[in-house]
Amino acid sequence: MDQFGDILEGEVDHSFFDSDFEEGKKCETNSVFDKQNDDPKERIDKDTKNVNSNTGMQTTENYLTEKGNERNVKFPPEHPVENDVTQTVSSFSLPASSRSKKLCDVTTGLKIHVSIPNRIPKIVKEGEGDYYTDGEESSDDGKKYHAKSKPAKPSTNVKKSIRKKYCKVSSSSSSSLSSSSSGSGTDCLDGGSDSHLSDSSPSSKKHVSGITLLSPKQKYKSGIKLTETQPSSTTPKCGHYPEESEDTVTDVSPLSTPDISPLQSFELGIANDQKVKVKKQENVSQEIYEDVEDLKNNSKYLKAAKKGKEKHEPDVSSKLSSVLDCSLDHRHKQKVLHDTMDLNHLLKAFLQLDKKGPQKHHFDQPSVAPGKNYSFTREEVRQIDRENQRLLKELSRQAEKPGSKSTIPRSADHPPKLYHSALSRQKEQQRIERENLALLKRLEAVKPTVGMKRSEQLMDYHRNMGYLNSSPLSRRARSTLGQYSPLRGASRTSSATSGLSCRSERSAVDPSSGHPRRRSKPPNVRTAWL
């Protein structure tokens, strides 16, 4: 164990192959000397023993291949590898004689009872690690051997080499067996059971080269599953192979199975049913009654399928999933059927409404009470009803006309009577209108006043300006008045009065013409701008 502890993952130490080859040579030399010394009878006995041991090893290999195949199907390949690598390498480092002894001890110590299944599952043999070596090439050329992954068929060379080694070991002398197995006796018992439990390869060639991919829990489970018995498939012990004849060996050839298992045939039937169902769901609205018939047929088919499943005894999970699928499909079909029926009813109702078109107003006639009428006789009551019906029809006909007006035009001779408040407002309005007309007439009759023309106003302005420039005394007096007056408005009034007085004096006698002019205004008249 310790001498191979430092081997890295992915590398192979080939030292044990050389030791294998040397041990094989020793065994061959011993067997040659023994064959020369033995009698012909002893040689015949040894040959029969070799044949029996070969057949025993073949049967164990066949059982191991079948059990390994089942375990490869059950267990996924993803498991930690490190602990198993060291164990398998350490167990494979023993010489060939010790390995043969180990196999014999394991098979004698443990009865192998393999339960033959009713049906063989489909096995995909991809990526099986098949390692084979050649001892002669390693001793002559010193080349390194590489692990090669091949399918299960080319591994017959490895089986033949293993059988030759086992034959050589069994034909060797007892001294070589005792000397080779004494050093590894305890390791055979301990490591043999571990290698037997951890072996999940499809054949015994994994003892030579393979690295198992099982955790310790799975090793324990696989060891337990080997002990499950079936009375028709018990095998003889390895130690008793030389004593029994070839006729007592149990035939372990694989049973003939049909091309399609019951589970696969049922799955094919379900797939076909699903295809038919998808096609029919495309036009459900047109095939409602066909869907009803399909539901009946499907229910019959599902019942028959359930009976077939009970006969074939499939797994519980497949039963549950199929029952759930069937119930879901049935519910889905019922839902689709109800939806299509509702849609069809709605479409029919809409079509009937469209056919009827716009309906006219229809007034329900009140039902005549059968009670006795004391105020009118029966003939009078009937006449009143007829008149009422006639009037009702007339009113309905006028209501249907768009431009009809039932309003009676009022006569223009009689105006509407007004209230006293409206009359007072009307009188006030008339008075205001009369006053406005009088003011308008007075404004239109007014003529323009004398001296209000623009030319006359300009002439007056120029005269006033010339007078102010020619008489500085008046300007000085005006300034003194402005200084002593407390208010500015008083100076304005004084200057205005003085100007008016001067103007009046000048206008009294015109020097150019000499004729006296008309006096415009007396001096006590107020000016317009004051």
Curated annotation (Swiss-Prot):
Modified positions (Phosphoserine) in chain numbering: S19, S138, S139, S215, S245, S327
Region annotated Disordered, chain positions: 29-83, 116-258, 395-417, 483-530
Biased composition (Low complexity): 170-203
Bias type Polar residues, positions: 50-63, 227-236, 491-501
One Gene Ontology term from the biological process aspect of the record: spermatogenesis
Chain intervals with Acidic residues compositional bias: 129-139
Protein's UniProt name: Cilia- and flagella-associated protein 97
